[in-house]
Structures are given as structure tokens and as C-alpha cells.
Amino acid sequence: MSKNSEFINLSFLLDHEKEMILGVLKRDEYLKKVEDKRIRKLKNELLEAKRRSGKTQQEASRVCVHCHRNLGLIFDRGDPCQACSLRVCRECRVAGPNGSWKCTVCDKIAQLRIITGEWFFEEKAKRFKQVNVLGTDVVRQSILRRSPGAEEVQSQEQTRQDAEKSDTSPVAGKKASHDGPKRKGFLLSKFRSATRGEIITPKTDTGRSYSLDLDGQHFRSLKSPPGSDRGSTGSSDLNDQEPGPRTPKSSRSNGVTPGTQSSPAPSTRTVTSVISREYGFENSMDLAAIEGTSQELTKSHRRNTSGTPSIAVSGTSLSSDQSRSELDLSESFTEDSEDTVSIRSKSVPGALDKDSLEETEESIDALVSSQLSTNTHRLASGLSTTSLNSMMSVYSETGDYGNVKVSGEILLHISYCYKTGGLYIFVKNCRNLAIGDEKKQRTDAYVKSYLLPDKSRNNKRKTKIRTGTNPEFNETLKYTISHTQLETRTLQLSVWHYDRFGRNSFLGEVEIPFDSWNFENPTDEWFVLQPKVEFAPDIGLQYKGELTVVLRYIPPEENLMLPPEQLQGNKTFKKGKKKESPVISGGILEVFIKEAKNLTAVKSGGTSDSFVKGYLLPDDSKATKHKTLVIKKSVNPQWNHTFMFSGIHPQDIKNVCLELTIWDKEAFSSNIFLGGVRLNSGSGVSHGKNVDWMDSQGEEQRLWQKMANNPGTPFEGVLMLRSSMGKCRL
């Protein structure tokens, strides 16, 4: 919010009134995070139900697609669901009105739209103009911003107070100079604590104050020091401001000394001053004085400035206390799946490899392909799109060079410190590991860890190399991350045999999700090492957000009604005889890219700079590529952009595939894949050939069929983004 028109004038509010409003806004922010967490949990439950149900059943199979119960030939044959057309048994049905019924998964999808309140936001979007700025943000920044005439008013107030203080004793002046930073520290600590979700109450008569830690869900009570003017806030942030005669930065920037700014001298505004002092404020300028300190808080109210440990490994970045997953992707981003040499090269088959020679965004993929062309097949399981930062990581993720059979266990002690935000993985030892080097009959093992889905170099931790099949490590791998963020992560620990020539051998791995992990009673626990999963069914089911699109197919007999400038084609400015525009036969596929929700945040401020790229397969040439504009600093972008593909006959609908992928725009590195969808008939066949990109299921397939069966009618659909654009295996 950089425009002045987005601020409202709240200068008439008293100090304690502003404090009360800010407290309400902080509670509102906390409730929003709780609601986002609830919605994310519901959607993860739906994805888990889909995963348990399996993929689309074959025609010859007589098994319930959800519970896998055997169906009979005559009795209890099962019936296809009226929504998804999958055959289910009687136990997996949910009856509806008028004798209709749905399978359990389809019913859960329908209920999810109601439970999460999506219907309300959809109706709101139809009635009111969509804006990217929330009302709470406008009020918060209006309170925190300095009014245009604040400095003039403040200078006049200082002059008047200096005249009144001329008769006071030096002791009183010294006390006032000490009192200013104290009150300033109290005000700043209020904002810091409120950002963490703590509700702070004023000091009571007994000298004790209570604060509710909303993240930890427990009460804390701290005794306020005797004679403290700031009271007790239950937060260690009180120690951040050392009382003393030195001038704070905020005061120096405004040309005001602490003594004059927060002097307890008598004033004509006695009632206001008394009320303000009860809540830790001296005058209305205290709110504006922290503007320089809380500049980042003003720009993003979810940015934590209290010193809460950062999610990013870099110590210079501030943490984001959102409930959604914010990834530290300043260096790179990978998805460890069998389907990706490069996420983009598999996402749009063949197209991005061609584009990489012409566009900066795919240059790293071309470099990877050229350098590792001889080992492309072996690198397919783990090569990152931007893993050139650490070639050692590339080789260690490429697979099992020694064909070692995985065996053994690893002993871990996992703990979390809520006060510092530190995750501690104490790697004690391993036992019964496989032999890494068969010729020398030795194993030089080390342990490597990631907090998935972030597989960047900054997110990697490694132990030292130990010799033997029962190595003793006794090392602690530490991550700094807030608890709300930790609930969205999965710890991946892998054991490797070190080879001096870089041909490391994979010895096993363990994945530990933290969404339901109990950190209250940490204990030592043995984990069995597992082989690397070649076909990872869960990779495609990770919740990456949603994309809202509107599809419409305009048949050939209606496309001549459109003006020529709406048809697909590039304008030319070459001199010479003007060429006639070719007559385009066939219909037009109109794709309206509306918006996306809950995208993965990859920037340090908890946002992304996202855009959508579209292809109509099998034509994956650069000429047919469509892109939207980049929407910056948002995880809920609204593009409202239309893609138009021409020359499509009705019989082509069942042979083509619309692929839409969302990317985060990076200035000096490869763009980061955020998710994608494919819309097609789901037959697996295109023009008589078996292809891996005709793999749509569920809502993707249903939306495509609706469009094909009703030419000329637009259909809107909300599609869950895939976390990997590899083929969905049956």
C-alpha cells in the first residue's frame, strides 16, 4: 500500500483507542491464521482420502475404487458414481436429495466448499469489485503512519514543554530522559508481542501481568520489576530497550530528544496523558516514533520483528508467522521425484528445452542438460532445476551408484524449543548399515537432512563422515523455524556412503512429517531406513494451492463472428506488401485465467511473484505458448487474463491437452515451479498414440468434458494444483 489514497485519517483517535484497535487487529490476524490452518488440514484430509482411494480403476477390474472391496458379478456389483463415474460399493455411497447419491470422496469435495466458506468468497467476488488490500491492513497502516503535519505539531509541543520544564530540577529531567526510552520500549514490545500472537494486559494493582501465548496455547505469568514504569508484558522483548540517556534511532530521525519527547511534565491534555500513561503511552507521537523501526511491519503485518527465529537459514532475513508454508528458496528449489530431470522439462514436454535457448528463465535447464547429457537417465530421480549451486548435492541425489541394498536403522532424538524457535535433530548413531564399497568392504557414512519441500542448499544439513556399518555420529542438526511453519514441513534424513570421486552411494532414508508430531515429550527413537521411493504417489498429492479457470469452446460455425484481432497470431511490422490474413478454420478454445489461492510463498516476506504459462499439447512450440502478466507480492494473485487457441475442430477436443503451470518469477535465476494442472479427456491416447500427458482425473477431467459437451457455454472450475507435472500413474 504505497498510495496515499489507501490511507484513512485516524488522527482524531486517542492513544489508548489506537492501542485497543491494534489489539483487535492482532487478534483478527491470529484468527485468520487459525482458519487458514483449519482449511489446510481439511484439504490435506481430502487429498489423503484420494490417495487411499487409488487411481482410476480399469474396466476389467471388479473392485470398489475407494475401499478396494471385491464386487460380485450378479449381486453387489457396485454402481458408478453419478459425479466421478467410478464404480463403488454400497458402503462408499452418501445419499442425497431426490434419491441421488455420490461416492464418499465426491461428497467430501462438495462439503469442503461449504465448510471452508469458499462459496461466500465466490459470491462476494461476483457482487463487489475485487481489491488486493484488506480493510484491516488499511486501518493498521493508517494508525502506524505519521500524519503530514506531525513533525510541525511535535516541534510546537516540544517548545511548549521545554518552557514548562525550565523550572524543574535536574533530577526530574534525568528521570524523564530515562523514562522516555522505557516507554518507547514498552510500546515497541507491545507491537512485537502482538505480532507473535500475544495479548498483553496492563499492569494490575498487584504488580503482576498476564499474557496469553496464542501460538503455544498456554498462559505465562511474569512478575513485573519493582518501580518499573513499563509494567510486565510477559515478553523478553522488554530487555531489548535499555533505559538510558542515549537517543533512540526513531527519535534521532525525527529530531527529537527522549527527554522532550516523553517528558512527564504537566500538560494541558491532562486527561489524555493520564489515560495514555496507564497503557504505556506518553503522547500521540509515540505511535509515529516507531515508524522507522517497524517499517517492515507496516508493509507486511505478518512480518515478525520481535526476534522470533527466522524460517530462512540466513540470519539476516525475518521470519513469517503465517500458517501457510513459506519456503526458503533464495537459492534453489527441487522436487525429489522420479519424474524430474527438470521440473519444467517434464512439465511441458519438449517445449521448455527449446525455449531455454531463447529465454533467460529456462537457461539453467539447458545448462544442466548439456553438462549431464551422458547421465540424463540416471539423474532423472533427483536433479533439481536450480541445483547448480551445489554440484555435490546434484550427485548425491542422482541415485544409488553402488546398487547397495538398503538396510539398517538410525537413532534420532528430535526436540523443539518454542522460546527460540529451534528444531534440534540429534543424530546419535546408525546400526546394521549396508556395505557402501564392496571392493574395499568399508562404509564411510554421513547423514544429510532437508525440511521438505524446501531442498535448497541453504536448507541442507550434513554430519561428519564416520567409518563402519555401526557409526556413532552424536551430532545435532539445527533448523530455525516457527512452530506454525514446522507443522507444514517433513523432515527427510538420508544416509550416504561418501566416495572421494563424488560417486556417493545411497544407504537409506527416513521421512518424518511434523503435522502431528508430539514435541512435548521428546525421546530417543529408532527409525528403519527405507529405500528411495521410485514412484512417489504422494508427490502429486501435496497441497500446492488452487487455480480458478473458465473454459469455453467456440465451434467453427461461430468463430467468424469474432473480430480478427481476437484470434491468435503475431503482428508483423516488416516493410513490403501487406499480406492478407489467412482464414482460420476450426473453432477456438478460450481459457480465462481468473485467479489462484494459497500458492506456495517463496519470497522472504511470505509472498510470490507469480505468472501462468499455458500450452495446448501436443503442439508445444514456442509460437503457441501463452503467458500472463506477473502479479507481484501475493500468494492469492488475480490475473483475469484470457488465452485463445484457434484452429481446433470438435474432433480434436479428445486428442489435445491444456497444460497450465504457475511459476514464481526470479530476476537472476531460474523461475520456481509452484504447481500446475492438465485438462484433457484422460484417455491416455492422442491421435492413436499412447502419451503420458493425457492423464487428467477428477475435477480436471470433469471440467474438460463439460466444455466439450456444451460448445459455446463457459464453465468455471476450481482445480487443485499438482506439485509435480509428471505422469499420474495408474
Curated annotation (Swiss-Prot):
Zinc finger (FYVE-type): 64-106
CDD domains tied to this protein: C2A_SLP-4_5, C2B_SLP_1-2-3-4, FYVE_Slp5
Topology relative to the membrane: Peripheral membrane protein
Subcellular location(s) per record: Membrane
GO cellular component, one term: plasma membrane
Residues with the Phosphoserine modification: 147
Keyword Phosphoprotein: yes
Tissue expr: Highly expressed in placenta and liver.
GO biological process: exocytosis; intracellular protein transport
UniProt biased composition (Polar residues): 248-271, 305-322
UniProt domain RabBD: residue ranges: 7-123
Keyword flag DNA-binding: no
Role this protein plays: May act as Rab effector protein and play a role in vesicle trafficking. Binds phospholipids.
Oligomer status and interactors: Binds RAB27A that has been activated by GTP-binding, and possibly also RAB3A and RAB6A.
Record protein name field: Synaptotagmin-like protein 5
Gene behind the chain: SYTL5
